[in-house]
Amino acid sequence: MEKEVNLYITPKSQDTDNIKDYLESAGVDFNVYDVHADFRVHKRMLEATRGACSAPVIEIGNQIVCGFDRERLEDTLAYELH
């Protein structure tokens, strides 16, 4: 079973744009959640990261990538999705 990829974002963020572009070019399906638009989404992101990260955050299965860390994102996607 393929794991969900969730992207917690803030609007108008260059890192968010970079992550979206990367995931789309890699053919990865992902869900987008705006932490500014919904308090429950913000709370869910904080719980997933244990408060250690601010948006954008990528959640892949139970793995978290904070910000646009291309190398970590590639490694995590390879491990979790393949």
PLM region spans:
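Conserved beta-strand scaffold positions in the cores of enzyme catalytic domains, especially
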Residues: 30-32, 64
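Thiol-/selenol-based redox modules, centered on thioredoxin-like
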Residues: 74-82
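ATP/adenylate-binding site constellation spanning eukaryotic-like Ser/Thr protein kinases
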Residues: 70
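Thioredoxin-like thiol-disulfide oxidoreductase module
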Residues: 34-51
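Local sequence-structure signature of Cys/Sec-based thiol-disulfide redox active-site neighborhoods
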Residues: 1-28
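Alpha-helical elements of the RecA-like P-loop NTPase motor core of helicases
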Residues: 17, 43, 74-75
